[in-house]
């Protein structure tokens, strides 16, 4: 593959700026002059709206700033992409990060797009969910799948580790997940039940569904929060994970909920609803045993109507463990067995009243026990 040394970044067809590969294989970024006049900072802490060339200093994102790394697929999508590139005769060692952004092109998560775009397979027919799930297992367990192009088209630019596709249902954009090889056949049902419980706990989530299957208990699906339909058609929403905002390696346990609450407070300009919702998510993750609460599982979305940021709807809420037996994000320094004491300490430090923090924590603990324990 011919390496793209320069690539342009767009937001709703407006030129945001340019990425260029340095000799040190880092992607330097510079805002376009017009964007500096009437745009916004696409990454408030890392890329202020200033006329200068910004070169990444951390190595977590393979020479990219976090905001652009958010556009790239995670484990599942990267596996699909690498398999497909090999199948088409490319040496993936020669594929740069700018090449990968060009491959993402218009199809990535969020609102940022990249040009020139690398042409990807286009296929109109959608196989059944059961067939796609079986093809996912082939990819995970072997080097072969006769649906590779279709699976990449449907899920090759998605985030997360589990197999998934991105598709339209009744004109709306959805993500549908399939079990990974380490999951049981009830993985979809479990995540669906977790989503319903989370909503009962007052946590903001998009619409979720359990799609039927003949080979497992069903496939979990959720409507995408980075796509909205309005009177002008489909609208893409700019989003940033906490990992990208803080330039953190999400694979390492390097964050505490104190940081997440502070981040929410600063970024949303002290939006009380969002601060409380982040607190509720922390409580839910603790009581529902969701320990895979890393920094890419918390996202903020840009509200262009109000020129500000909001906490996104929650996602990836399900039973999970870590190899080290603790939460990836600690709670007041405690990752192994945090409880009411640690939860309220985080909430009060963020400016919430202690009585409210305590009540929310106990209410969520009770709801989780009633809805999820023993199942």
Question: For each predicted feature, which ranges?
Answer:
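Phosphate/dinucleotide-binding and metal-coordinating scaffold of catalytic cores
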Residues: 1-295, 299-375
